[in-house]
């Protein structure tokens, strides 16, 4: 296992900056999910950790080693791509052992690791099948063949995006079980915030190449750092009302609603000014019919 640290990491292509001054610390054994809308830079960030993209500036560490100039094959990472990248002419066993054969591993070692990983992934009965004989739910399991290389860090780039809703739910459960069983550091990329909420120990919300907020799923849900996070995390989404601050007290703020009604809200008033125009965020489950509300 290994921790992953990004210190002031920036990625740019010419004048186009796609990741801006990223600072993250991922602990040994954590399941961390990068989430955000399309184009926010989450896959680019994952590819920099993998070594498939260079770091323009800043420092990337896996464990105690600075990895900026270390080739991908020497980083101790295993990556699962959205496309699965299964060789159609090879059996499941041959797909799983391909990387070890390229690395020159002994046949006994290859056979032992393939057998062990097949048991973990519940694929032992499929080892002789080729790709076209696998169902849609079996292919993602084979794609996690990177386990045979015993990586310190797993990187998963939207591995379930090609599946239907029912299979996605099933595979989420399997990936969660796999993480608990192995205890390895996992970094998972998705644009699906429901997937992020159900899988992650910690979520990194990205917006336009910057880190908008880092925290546990319920922390982001109940205490979003800004309006973007508040509107992105949660299904259904948070509702917003324009309000005006009319008074403040210790740990309370009074606001005027669009219908001119004034209400006190139990929120931090330290950085709120009377007269400021703000947005009031309301989750659907926080609303009650007036005849039963306090």
From Swiss-Prot:
An example Gene Ontology CC term for this record: maltose transport complex
Function text: Part of the ABC transporter complex MalEFGK involved in maltose/maltodextrin import. Responsible for energy coupling to the transport system.
Family to which the UniProt record says this protein belongs: Belongs to the ABC transporter superfamily. Maltooligosaccharide importer (TC 3.A.1.1.1) family.
Residues that coordinate or bind ATP: 36-43
Topological relation to the membrane, as annotated: Peripheral membrane protein
Location within or outside the cell: Cell inner membrane
Subunit structure: The complex is composed of two ATP-binding proteins (MalK), two transmembrane proteins (MalG and MalK) and a solute-binding protein (MalE).
UniProt lineage: Bacteria, Pseudomonadati, Pseudomonadota, Gammaproteobacteria, Enterobacterales
Catalytic class of the enzyme: translocase
Annotated Pfam families: ABC_tran (PF00005), OB_MalK (PF17912)
Keywords, alphabetical: ATP-binding, Cell inner membrane, Cell membrane, Membrane, Nucleotide-binding, Sugar transport, Translocase, Transport
Domain ABC transporter: 4-233
InterPro entries, A to Z: AAA+_ATPase, ABC_transporter-like_ATP-bd, ABC_transpr_MalK-like, ABC_transpr_MalK/UgpC-like, Mo/tungstate-bd_C_term_dom, OB_MalK-like, P-loop_NTPase
A GO molecular function held by the record: ABC-type maltose transporter activity
Transmembrane domains' residue ranges: none
Name recorded for this polypeptide: Maltose/maltodextrin import ATP-binding protein MalK
Gene: malK
Primary localization: membrane
Translocase among keywords: yes
Catalytic function, reaction form: D-maltose(out) + ATP + H2O = D-maltose(in) + ADP + phosphate + H(+)
E.C. no: 7.5.2.1
């Amino acid at each position: 296992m290994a921790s992953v640290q990004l210190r002031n990491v920036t990625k740019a292509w010419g004048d186009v900056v796609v990741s801006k001054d990223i600072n993250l610390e991922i602990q040994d054994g954590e399941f961390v999910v990068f989430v955000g809308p399309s184009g926010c830079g989450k896959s680019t960030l994952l590819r920099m950790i993998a070594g498939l993209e260079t770091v323009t500036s800043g420092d990337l560490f896996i464990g105690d080693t600075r990895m900026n100039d270390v080739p991908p094959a020497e980083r101790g990472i295993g990556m699962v791509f959205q496309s699965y990248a299964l060789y159609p002419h090879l059996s499941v066993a041959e797909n799983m052992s391909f990387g070890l054969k390229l690395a020159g591993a002994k046949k006994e070692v290859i056979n032992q690791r393939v057998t062990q990983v097949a048991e973990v992934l519940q694929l032992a009965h499929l080892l002789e099948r080729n790709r076209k004989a696998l169902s849609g739910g079996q292919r993602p399991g084979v794609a996690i063949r990177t386990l045979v290389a015993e990586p310190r860090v797993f990187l998963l780039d939207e591995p379930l995006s090609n599946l239907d809703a029912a299979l996605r739910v099933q595979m989420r459960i399997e990936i969660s079980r796999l993480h608990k069983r192995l205890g390895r550091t996992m970094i998972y990329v998705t644009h699906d915030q429901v997937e992020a909420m159900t899988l992650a120990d910690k979520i990194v919300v990205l917006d336009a190449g910057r880190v908008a907020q880092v925290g546990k799923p319920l922390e982001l849900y109940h205490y979003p750092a800004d309006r973007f996070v508040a509107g992105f995390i949660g299904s259904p989404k948070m509702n917003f009302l324009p309000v005006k601050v009319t008074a403040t007290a210790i740990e309370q703020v009074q606001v005027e609603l669009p219908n001119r009604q004034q209400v006190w809200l139990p929120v931090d008033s330290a950085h709120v000014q009377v007269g400021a125009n703000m947005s009031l965020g309301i989750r659907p489950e926080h609303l009650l019919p007036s005849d039963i509300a306090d």
